[in-house]
Amino acid sequence: MVNEVGEMDSVSPDDHNNSGISVFEIDSPDYKLNFLSWILDITQEEADKGFEFLKRNNKSIEVLWDLLENLKVFTVVVEDHYVDRVYRDSYYFYYSGKHFSYTRFCKRLSIFDGKLEKNFFDYCSEELQQKFVGTIVIRPIPERSIGRTLLSPKYFLPIDKNGYVRLAKYVVTVFGKQLEVWAFPYGMQDGETTSCAEVTILNLLDYYSQSYPEYHYLLPSEISHLVEKSSFERRMPTTGLSYELISKVFCEAGFYPRLYSAKKMPKNKFRHILSYYIESGIPVAIGLKIAEENKHSIICIGHMQPEKIQLGQILNCANNSESDNVVWVSDTADLVDTYCFMDDNKRPYNISECVEVAKLNTSILSLDGFEVEYMMVPLYKRMILEAADAYDICMSVIASPKFGIKSFSQEWDSETKKITWKY
């Protein structure tokens, strides 16, 4: 491949065999590109068009290249005949009926930080655990090949700023070695059995079913059958789902979801509600408007640490209607504008700002330049109060002359009063 990464050489597992398994040590951009081209079955004709052409026209190359950019030297253990439950389900209810032939098997990449100095089987699980980054499933589907991916965020989040994300514990077995990874699941849509909407459902249910015994996982065929009950046309190949249908699927999965529209409330309130749920440890689905007829769905799983120096610069009024008491409150939701997302068009743990911008004599919430339209929150059935109601109750209590801040503020010294509240 002619470009800044040099020419493409052939890569095969036979060249890197480690006691019967395929082990690759990636220590240069050249070799990383060669490996990705081999694992994704890039033809020589495509490779000859250059690195930039591949990044523009193959989403899997683009995402994997960006994802592995932070790992300067790493080792990949490849399992050739891996059975992935999501792809195998899609294969039997859709791909097996197509005219073209698709294999039933995937490849799974197990990634380790640095080089493995010894034979893979000479390591014990505890030694491998210290280097374990996670796993990536490669489906036998052109262009959108990345399947279920479980990666530790510590290798991919910014090292110069703290972040807070929701993760679940996954146990994986790599050629008999049992390893653990704390991750939020990621995967790409295949464009036929799954769109971004179905991927949002799959990854959220994967996280919740892994974290809490009350929930169970749904496969693509099960999601399709649930949606068919509320649809008036065929579901395969998929054309995507509305956020009303996404919410309906979560109802069927045992959740009591709450659906918010950014157009039906002040943008500042919508942004506050997003912050409240994320700060409460509840991953949510976000609906974006890419173009007039083009929508996209992603998952918000956390936020970056806000700058505390901004505390107190934005104040919100809490008033009590009975006594006319007024208290000015600094809401930490005003400090958070940088969130962590799982977007199947980008690498896992993508960091983006959610800000309010002016557009055509109005204002919209913008995320990476796209308008935020919806937020779907998969709530537990016992969570009676949703965020907006809980906020109103808290603000009324704060301003209450009987139970609020003023009821016990007389016990504070003057310095505490100065930095904590003011009339």
Question: What do the PLM-derived regions correspond to, one by one?
Answer:
Residues 65, 92, 220-224, 247, ...:
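Generic detector of well-ordered alpha-helical segments enriched in charged/polar residues
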Residues 174, 186, 201-204, 278, ...:
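Generic hydrophobic secondary-structure signal
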Residues 132, 145, 159-160, 168-169, ...:
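Short, well-ordered loop/turn elements at secondary-structure boundaries
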Residues 247-327, 332, 338-339:
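Active-site-adjacent substructure of cysteine-protease-like catalytic cores
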